[in-house]
Structures are given as structure tokens and as C-alpha cells.
Amino acid sequence: MSAGRRSSGGRSAAAPRFTPPRGRAPLAVALDAPDAATALRWAAAVAPTVAVLKIGLELFYREGPAIVTALRAAGVLAGAGGAAVAAGGTGSAPELFLDLKLHDIPATVAGGMRSITPLGPRFVTVHAAGGAAMIRAAIEAAPDVEVAVVTVLTSLDVAALSAIGLAGPPSDAVRRLAVLAVEAGARTLVCSPREVRMVRMELGSNVTLITPGVRPAGSETGDQARTATPEAALVGGSDLVVVGRPITGAPDPGVAARAIAAGLSAAGRAADLL
């Protein structure tokens, strides 16, 4: 449905589709670090290049909100208003993506969203499987945050989905959950690069699509089941590609980030010619 689906309201319904600042790649680096010092080192290396820094469960559970404060103090993460400037960068520093995948009853998720809003994230993830009421509660509790609704984890293949009662190809579950999320008011979705083209065609151009499970050609897939290259994800309709280990596990994360950014830039130019 190229015209997109109507939502039930909320700030996310009016949020503009994500566009990286000038000079920054549509790339989020997953700071899945074992400690704050490692996260700060990785962030400093990639901050001049990328649009977003993603903090997930491992780092946030270990360090708590203090890691956000530390990244901002180091000048490698934008403030709540996006005003900080990264050393060596071209404009404001990367924005904050809290990938906490909230999934609970609506009141509890709403309370969680209110608790983390003061940290000034651009994105916070919740699970679509929590249902429409939970998604609406998250959006209403944090009107200044883009609630990014996770459809189906990129680690789940056909067999894994069948084992939890979701028979059929992953694309079917992704489509159902994406439509549910948008009808509940979401305007930012998380899906694998294998399904991003389908979701874009179904929901149109007014939805921000974030794609984890992205691996440069030749990289190990690890525990990811539904992957594609950064370039394929972008051409398929992704607005923000998430890359972790291929960057943070590289000998020089900054060089790795710049190489992926260059590939994304070339893919974007090629897509514009289609």
C-alpha cells in the first residue's frame, strides 16, 4: 500500500522520516561493549562518520544512564537537542538510540518510557508483539521520542518462528506486525533487510525503517539469520542501517565505519538514478 496506512495518532504519526545530518551516513553503530571504556573508544572512532550510536541491553544494563552522560561529556553524542558537536565531525554529533526492546503490559512500558525520556534518545525500541495498546502507551508516554517498533528479530528463521507458533515465512509475520504498529500510531519500524522492501511497499514513504542484521559482503553472520549488505538494505528502502560487530570488531572501527559509509553513499547515488 504505497500511500501508507493511517494511524490512530500520537507524536510518532507526525514525526518526519529520518534523514541523517549533512555529512553523516545513514548508519547506526551498535555499541555492544563489555564496559564503558570500550564503548567510549568505539564511539570516538566512529562519531565523525555515523548518524546514530545505538546502546543496547548489554551496555545499558552494565553501566546504566551514566554511559549516556559519559558519551556526551566526551563530545561523541548529541545532547537531547542535538546540539553537541563531535570532534572531527561535520556538524552535530551522532544521536542516541536506546535499543531496550521494551515488552510488558502497557502501564509498565509507559512508565519505562517516561523514565528514560530525560536521557534524550532519538529512538527507543519496543516489541510489536506487545500489542497495539502497549505501542500506543509507549508513544503517548514519550511524545518527544521516536518509538521504534521491532517486528521480528533478525535472529529468527522459519524454524524458530514456527517453534513459537508463527508458522509461515518471516515476511508474513513482519507484515502483520508492521501494519499493527502503524495502525497503533507508530511511525518508526525495525525490520530485517530481507523484508525492508516489502514493508516500504506496504506502508509507503512516511514511515522510518531501521534495519539491523546488516553485514558487509564477506562478513560473518554470527547469530543473525536474515541478513543483507548495507547497500542492499538502503536500496531496499531502509532509512537507517545498524551495524555492530563488523565495525566494532575491526582493527580500526573508524576505518570500517568510513568504508561502509562510502558504500552507502554510492548505493544512494545509484538508487537516485533508478
From Swiss-Prot:
PROSITE patterns: OMPDECASE (PS00156)
UniProt GO molecular function: orotidine-5'-phosphate decarboxylase activity
Catalytic activity field: orotidine 5'-phosphate + H(+) = UMP + CO2
Biased composition (Low complexity): 1-15
Gene3D superfamilies linked: Aldolase class I
Database matches in SUPFAM superfamilies: Ribulose-phoshate binding barrel
Pfam family, one: OMPdecase
EC code: 4.1.1.23
Family of this protein: Belongs to the OMP decarboxylase family. Type 1 subfamily.
PANTHER family: OROTIDINE 5'-PHOSPHATE DECARBOXYLASE (PTHR32119:SF2)
Task of the protein: Catalyzes the decarboxylation of orotidine 5'-monophosphate (OMP) to uridine 5'-monophosphate (UMP).
Subunit field text: Homodimer.
Listed name of the protein: Orotidine 5'-phosphate decarboxylase
Protein's organism: Frankia casuarinae (strain DSM 45818 / CECT 9043 / HFP020203 / CcI3)
Organism taxonomic ancestry: Bacteria, Bacillati, Actinomycetota, Actinomycetes, Frankiales
